[in-house]
């Protein structure tokens, strides 16, 4: 019995998708670094040049930080564990309550500008003002993207971050240093 090529297309497509998925897992496994040597920023907005922002932040970190990852929330769908352990977040105001247990109180050094209160203490600092259309890293972050609700965005610190000196088990204060660079 002779098989036609068109009969094999679904199997070939499945093989190609599985191959890409497996190779991406192998690549991530080989190139990833321990959490103590990596700083992660998740942004709940479309990103246009996340690599440029990551390089900009890597330039201000200490030499023991081997990697800065800037990810959109879409990427996090693959690994909810990774997003919950992020060091920094930039999130729209309407989503903050949904992810509220991921955030720590804002360190003193970041308590500048317009602050967002949670449980009686500052948890975020405004990085995008929807009314004025002004904010940080606007050339990289699509705060006012047509697919998003236009709203204020805040920078928040992850409660599981190893890079905030005031946290238990912290190894350094690099998340705060990167946040300060973003806020300039």
Q: What kind of region is each of these model predictions?
A:
Residues 168-184:
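Surface-exposed amphipathic alpha-helical segments
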Residues 1-4:
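N-terminal Lys/Arg-rich, disordered targeting/topogenic segments
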Residues 111-167:
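A structural signal for short loop-to-beta-strand junctions that line the ligand-binding cleft
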Residues 76-131:
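Extracytoplasmic "Venus flytrap"/periplasmic binding protein-like
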Residues 38, 42-96:
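Early extracytoplasmic/lumenal segment of secretory-pathway proteins
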Residues 6-29:
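Hydrophobic membrane-insertion alpha-helices, especially the h-region
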Residues 50-54, 103, 176-179:
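Extracytoplasmic/secreted envelope proteins and their assembly/folding machinery
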Residues 29-37:
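Short domain-boundary/entry signatures in modular proteins, especially
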